[in-house]
């Protein structure tokens, strides 16, 4: 049975990889990509919730007077 000649495999694989890389670069460079989105200034309206309209004081245990 004859032995398989692998002496040309290296140059074949390298040249096909280079060819695929060049074709991919040409394909990507021909595409048109959209521009980066411009930032939009958003003005948020502060909505008062019912618990913010009422004044409440929370007494912590440390702030209570000594008994």
Curated annotation (Swiss-Prot):
Coiled coil: none annotated. GO terms for molecular function: proton transmembrane transporter activity. It is a single-pass membrane protein. It is found in: Mitochondrion membrane. The modification N6-succinyllysine is found at residue 54. Keywords: Acetylation, ATP synthesis, CF(0), Hydrogen ion transport, Ion transport, Membrane, Mitochondrion, Transmembrane, Transmembrane helix, Transport. Signal peptide: none annotated. One of its GO terms (biological process) is proton motive force-driven ATP synthesis. The chain crosses the membrane at residues 8-24. InterPro entries: ATP8_mammal (IPR039017), ATP8_metazoa (IPR001421). It holds the Pfam family ATP-synt_8. One of its GO terms (cellular component) is mitochondrion. The modification N6-acetyllysine is found at residues 54, 57. Belongs to the ATPase protein 8 family. Subunit 8, of the mitochondrial membrane ATP synthase complex (F(1)F(0) ATP synthase or Complex V) that produces ATP from ADP in the presence of a proton gradient across the membrane which is generated by electron transport complexes of the respiratory chain. ATP synthase complex consist of a soluble F(1) head domain - the catalytic core - and a membrane F(1) domain - the membrane proton channel. These two domains are linked by a central stalk rotating inside the F(1) region and a stationary peripheral stalk. Component of the ATP synthase complex composed at least of ATP5F1A/subunit alpha, ATP5F1B/subunit beta, ATP5MC1/subunit c (homooctomer), MT-ATP6/subunit a, MT-ATP8/subunit 8, ATP5ME/subunit e, ATP5MF/subunit f, ATP5MG/subunit g, ATP5MK/subunit k, ATP5MJ/subunit j, ATP5F1C/subunit gamma, ATP5F1D/subunit delta, ATP5F1E/subunit epsilon, ATP5PF/subunit F6, ATP5PB/subunit b, ATP5PD/subunit d, ATP5PO/subunit OSCP. PANTHER family: ATP SYNTHASE PROTEIN 8. This is ATP synthase F(0) complex subunit 8. It comes from Mus musculus (Mouse). The lineage of its organism: Eukaryota, Metazoa, Chordata, Craniata, Vertebrata.
